[in-house]
Amino acid sequence: MQKARIKLASTNIKALNEVTDQIKQIAERTGVRMSGPIPLPTKRIRITTRKSPDGEGTATFDRFELRVHKRLVDIEADERAMRQIMRIRVPEDVTIEIELIS
């Protein structure tokens, strides 16, 4: 049987967990084997900029950080389960990538 590998990424961890919970519920309802969600390392993007636009004065800096949370879910590629997963309403800040593997 084929498997589907679902990769989820988002800056909003609550929205990401809601989508993974919906995938879990679909797997339980359809009776399909599932492994995950596996939390992958969080990517931290840091940007440091000078506060002063002209370069005069003391060197003070602003620090900004963006965290990208990722999850990985492997599920059996049952036709019924995959149709239901495709119908999940996904928030704009969550990206989903579905890949079929054998």
Curated annotation (Swiss-Prot):
Q: What's the name of the protein? A: Small ribosomal subunit protein uS10
Under InterPro entries, the record lists: Ribosomal_uS10, Ribosomal_uS10_CS, Ribosomal_uS10_dom, Ribosomal_uS10_dom_sf, Ribosomal_uS10_euk/arc
Cite the source lineage: Archaea, Methanobacteriati, Methanobacteriota, Thermococci, Thermococcales
Q: What does this protein do?
A: Involved in the binding of tRNA to the ribosomes.
Q: Which Gene3D superfamilies match?
A: Ribosomal protein S10 domain (3.30.70.600)
Family, similarity comment: Belongs to the universal ribosomal protein uS10 family.
Q: Give one GO biological process term.
A: translation
**Species in which this protein is naturally found:** Thermococcus gammatolerans (strain DSM 15229 / JCM 11827 / EJ3)
Q: Name one GO molecular function term.
A: structural constituent of ribosome
Under the heading PROSITE patterns, the entry gives: RIBOSOMAL_S10 (PS00361)
